[in-house]
Amino acid sequence: VIVSNLSVCMVTCWYRNISMANYSENLINALMRRDISVKVVTSDCVCKNKYRDSSSLFNGKYCLVTTPFDSYGDEPDRSRIRGLSYRTSRIPLGWLYAKQCRDSDILHYQQSNVFSFGQLPLLTLPIQRKGPHTVVTVHNLDPHPLYRVYHYADAVIVHTEQQKDRMVQAGIPENKIHVVFHGGHKVNLRGLVRTRVTFFGSPAKYKGFFDLLKALRILRDKGIKINLEVYGIYGKEEEQTAKKEARRNNVEDQIQWYGSLSELEFDEKMQESIFTFAIYPVPVWGSSIITRAMMNGTPVIATPLGGSSEYLGDTGTYVPPNDPSALASVIRSLLENRRLQEDLGKMARQRALQYLSWDAIAEKTIRIYQSVIDA
């Protein structure tokens, strides 16, 4: 039996159009459709510098928690002393978050590997004896994670079985860990002509973008010139680094650089894409690019890391990480096979509608809330 009048305090990144904020917003909307009361608690983080020219940082209603050192995170070239001060100041954020959540039944912490929403605020969990039940969704594991902090959460949510296995191996009790897929918002297919090859997200090396540039160079050397459109929220420094790498590979004239998109524009560009990429060289646990591509019926070329294959199944086209030659071969073969493009897109959408709806994600999440309350 579900507790009536359940209240949840969602601690999350809330920057407009950042993937984790989109995740939280979609989950919150689905929870509220089930009469769950949700309060959003957020703070500034290092991504703030990406919004320097924007008049709007956040979505909807929220409670903003601040510390004296927040401005240091907005400095791309901060000194080592300021960097240390900023990192250290993230720890007491855990107390400040909990203070805002003290009247809720559940404190649901959306953890990324970014400072204000990373593991540092969770270091206060062991000494927070009173307060709501704590549920932590781990979107990305830190490179050097402090796994002990998860022992003090009432439940931990991860996005793939691979991620769960990694945490069990680190000693986290298996009965605390729940696998809940990253959701995707259902969209209507508009019958748009698919003519674009696109990359969504930051054009960074850790996203596989540099491997993609090398693959484009390999194809160009074989007489196949492919234009690539880049969409996402990224800073000028990231863009300049990526442009330098494009010049080094002699493909700079093939890249069109675009900025962030509204939700409607994102789906439109996705539906105009022949295929897109999730070619991470390291595990990314629950990619919103994959889920959104699937909902839009767009084929995905992916590396089989972090559980990508758990989402895509037979609908994915897979390449080894850090292998531009294999990537070039897959791009060419998929471009030359229109029937395969159509079949993969249809199967991906069917799979997404079956497993990845936000209503299904919310139902699983509510059952986890209930389990920690009943424990």
Which stretches of residues belong to each language-model region?
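Conserved acidic donor-binding segment of nucleotide-sugar-dependent glycosyltransferases
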Residues: D314-P324, S333-R338
